[in-house]
Amino acid sequence: KLCDMVTPQMRVAGKVLVSESGVSDTDDIKVLAKSHADALLIGTVLMEAVKPQELIAEFKGVYDNEYDKTELIDQNGLTEVKICGITSMVDVNLLIKYGADYGGMVVFYPKSKRDVTIEEAGRMVEILKKSDIKTVAVTVSPDEEQILKIQDKGFDYVQIHGELSENVYNLCKLPIIRAVNISQDDTDSVKKSIESATAMDKVVGILLDAGIPGSGKTFDWDSVKELELKEKKLFLAGGLNSSNVAAAIKCVEPDVVDISSGVEYDDVLIKGKDEQKVKEFICNARAAK
């Protein structure tokens, strides 16, 4: 009961939640797993155990199995989180640890510093799928050969920026997330792009971004209210970070918030995602109302 007093903000601040009593068997461990405690203090039952090390291993196995890694707090009805531009197994483990809903990998776009080979992406897909995290191949103006290679690696979605040719569309068997760059000085062009995308049956989501993907730039969120997305899922990207994600969710009410540069290290020479930023972003997104 007391675990309800631990707020998401306290977790983000690095407060450690310890459960200090009441453990006698694996059923108790299963109950405590729902609290997302960082540590369990177990005394008497271990002191009385014939083989305490084996009991610790059993308790830990049960706890890890019961711990719902896709939740930091109750997520029912809340905005989902997509971490884009992951480049390594270290990034993959962060998504699993903090409960991201989607993991995006940039492929066939060497201009991006986040570009990975299709083989590297495939290995990350295998691990993410085991944790029920949806996988997204992020690419720009793919050709027919590239779309086939993406499909062969078992991605759940393909996110397409730039051009989407008729041949590629017809060949694609994956659900498509169509990216649209929001330009404040060309509203008509944006509306036409969205109208075209929403008319496509294979397009299940519209991703709204500002300028160059991964640039960290925002756009006028109020402008989204004027757009007709029909029944397509709305992915909101562009300049999001842990400080503004709650405001973005409140203003736009997106289905998914999408972040890349906002969870990377301040030092541009360090590649990959910053664990503290990933944790803060996901926790703040979950807490937003």
Briefly describe each language-model feature range:
Residues 22-23, 35-58, 100-112, 157-165, ...:
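Glycine-rich phosphate-binding active-site loops on the catalytic face of alpha/beta enzymes
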Residues 1-42:
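Catalytic-face loop-and-helix region of soluble metabolic enzyme cores
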Residues 31-35, 58, 94-97, 149, ...:
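Well-formed, non-transmembrane alpha-helical positions, independent of function
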Residues 32, 43, 95, 158, ...:
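Conserved, mostly hydrophobic/aromatic
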Residues 5, 33, 46-76, 117-128, ...:
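C-terminal helical cap(s) of enzyme catalytic domains, especially alpha/beta-barrels
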Residues 12, 35-36, 98-99, 153, ...:
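Structural motif
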Residues 1-13, 104-113, 119-244, 264:
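Conserved anion-binding
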Residues 18-24, 73-88, 136-142, 181-188:
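Active-site mouth loops of central-metabolism enzymes
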